Amino acid sequence: SVNLEKNRKKTLNAVKLCEAVKKEVYPKVLVVGGGIFGTTSATMLSNAGYNVTLHEELDSIMKCASNINQYRLHKGYHYPRSKETVNECLDGIKQFKRKYGDSVVNGDINHFYAISSRDSLVSSEDYIKFLDDMGLEYNLHEPINGTDLTIEVDEELFDSDKLTIQSSYKMKGVGVNVVLNKHTTKEDFDDYDYVVIATYSKLNELLDNKKQYQYEVVEKPVVRLPDSYKNKSVVVMDGPFMCLDPYKSDLHVLGHVKHAIHSTNVGDYPMVLNKDIVGYLNNGVISNPKITKIQRFIEAGMEFFEDF
């Protein structure tokens, strides 16, 4: 007869032994930043045999840029002036769905792209030619207000909550040591053979050779729209215009090329000119914030969207 309990203990001991050997023998890697780039890097490195620790400054992974977005998986429709970007999008989607397919939302969401009748950098004719040249599928749709062309396309969104769960599960599955509420300093590097910095807007804080970037403080309003917009994602192009995407079950998140930006600067670090807005940054959805550009979003949306 087989002693299952004894075999189970042997298996557990073997796993613990492997983990102990891994910690002593394999190179130690520190990944700083718990967004999608950091968690993916940590998982892949641990999978490759490295002994990986991930530091996240906040109390959970995926709370900053990875979770404050339009949640759209771009297939390239958004980039008619860059075929290279389209190809990068198509390749990126394949990789994303291989790694995080369970977070992708298909459902009954309808995706639309529209070319504005004014101030668009691309004409309707050129946009259609671009789609045909790149092999991007589309169906012509009745143009929405203020547009010369509206098409329906086959795109997808991702659920940020599901992505967070899946990222955590993957890291746990390959033995990544996740340390939350950890402010990382250069002194922490001494304990590791390699360091991966994946802190997005804070890249330069831990680097000696700093690079200049353009930083933007951006607002993404979360709103409840009329029922006619339920399960609809709309992007107005190609200029300083509006977009809206479903968020959770009955809400939408808004974007605007111009009005979403509260401040911008080029330099080594981001500069938040309005100090009163600091408490809003990377702090989830804030109900009725005192500082907001929502009225400008509404005015811009009324040009294209009925009952907005």
Language model features: what each stretch is:
Residues P80, I115-S124, L149-Y169, N288-K293:
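Short beta-strand to alpha-helix junction loop
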Residues G267-F308:
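Flavin-binding catalytic cores
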Residues M62, Y194-G239, Y247-H252, A260, ...:
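Central helical "cap/lid" subdomain
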Residues N47-S66:
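Glycine-rich FAD pyrophosphate-binding loop
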Residues I151-T184, Y194, A198-N204:
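Helical element adjacent to the flavin cofactor pocket in flavoenzyme catalytic cores
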Residues K28-T53:
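N-terminal Rossmann-like FAD-binding beta1-loop-alpha1 element of flavoenzymes
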Residues Q70-G146:
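Dinucleotide-binding Rossmann-like beta1-alpha1 core, especially the glycine-rich loop
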Residues S1-K28, N47:
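Extreme N-terminal leader/targeting segments of oxidoreductases
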